[in-house]
């Protein structure tokens, strides 16, 4: 028995299959976030830019980039796990299946299933004389089978978060602002799609405004409080891209998530009770935050389409809720935690 275990361990080592929290929780998660940024998020930014400038080509290009988010995330994970070329390329199909079948939980489904498919592909790679057939076939069949079996259930987890958010929308504005802001903001940072959840729930009005506040608190909060470690590049990639880039760091030290989450708990009720910030644009914009400024553009288009007379108070509220307060509050909370030793130098390094 002991000899058999040693034989398996030796085989895994030869195949570079390292079952560890660091490889799966840090390396794979970080790579997935980059894959998401290089497809859905940069595509959203390009598409939004095209819509605002009236450039159809940019709208089309952005749409193409966003459409391959699943394959991009899966390939990124395979690269981080040192998948062989045939296995790496085969993960493109796996990512497409997992993302589509996972619905609002697509990114999480891609993350879990791509890891398994990549590792299985590594185990069979170059073990036969027909490797060009075996490795892609095994990788794709394992990945797509797992997607068909489990991705819908993973999507149901994201839908459960959506149900919780819907319950929160029925609360009075103060509590609703806190709960919706915190939940949607956390969903944005987690490997689930906050935008898809908001779209599925039709999250607009005051609840949509609270969702925007929560997403901005996470994105701007992480971008500003990690500026010392990540500079301008980190400021832009998180502030206009996604706070999910910080997930590996959150897994290492969950306390890094406290500052932007506390900021969301404050800006949410301010948005609903003081500024009456509403999202009357597309519901999907409620879950985008500052990604390509989609959230802010959604609020603005809602103002215009509703025929609302936009006042200086409205603009001040939008700027404070989306940019100023998240930056200031997250920085203050982060500095307090740094002084307590809960957040250390390098904890937020991308």
Regions found by a protein language model. Name each.
Residues 2-350:
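Pore-lining transmembrane helices
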């Amino acid at each position: 028995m002991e000899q058999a275990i040693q034989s398996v361990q030796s085989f895994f080592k030869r195949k570079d299959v390292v079952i560890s929290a660091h490889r799966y929780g840090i390396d794979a998660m970080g790579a997935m976030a980059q894959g998401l940024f290089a497809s859905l998020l940069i595509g959203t930014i390009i598409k939004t830019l095209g819509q605002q400038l009236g450039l159809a080509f940019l709208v089309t290009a952005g749409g193409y980039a966003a459409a391959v988010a699943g394959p991009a995330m899966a390939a990124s994970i395979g690269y981080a796990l040192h998948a062989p070329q045939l296995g790496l390329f085969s993960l493109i199909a796996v990512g497409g299946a997992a993302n589509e079948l996972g619905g609002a939980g697509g990114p999480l489904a891609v993350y879990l299933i791509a890891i398994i498919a990549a590792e299985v592909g590594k185990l069979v790679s170059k073990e036969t004389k027909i490797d060009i057939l075996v490795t892609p076939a095994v990788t794709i069949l394992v990945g797509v089978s797992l997607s068909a079996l489990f991705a819908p259930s993973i999507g149901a987890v994201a839908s459960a978060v959506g149900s919780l958010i819907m319950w929160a929308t029925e609360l009075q504005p103060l509590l609703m602002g806190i709960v919706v802001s915190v939940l949607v903001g956390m969903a944005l940072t987690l490997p689930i799609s906050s935008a898809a959840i908001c779209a599925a729930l039709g999250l607009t009005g005051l609840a949509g405004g609270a969702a925007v506040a929560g997403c901005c608190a996470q994105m701007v909060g992480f971008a500003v409080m990690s500026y010392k470690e990540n500079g301008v590049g980190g400021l832009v990639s998180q502030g206009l891209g996604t706070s999910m880039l910080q997930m590996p760091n959150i897994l290492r030290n969950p306390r890094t998530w406290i500052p932007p989450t506390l900021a969301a708990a404050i800006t949410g009720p301010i948005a609903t009770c003081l500024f009456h910030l509403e999202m009357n644009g597309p519901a999907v914009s409620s879950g985008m935050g500052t990604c390509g400024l989609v959230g802010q553009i959604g609020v603005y288009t809602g103002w215009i389409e509703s025929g609302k007379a936009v006042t200086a108070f409205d603009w001040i509220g939008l700027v404070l809720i989306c940019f100023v307060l998240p930056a200031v509050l997250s920085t203050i909370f982060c500095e307090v935690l740094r002084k307590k030793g809960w957040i250390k130098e390098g904890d937020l390094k991308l």
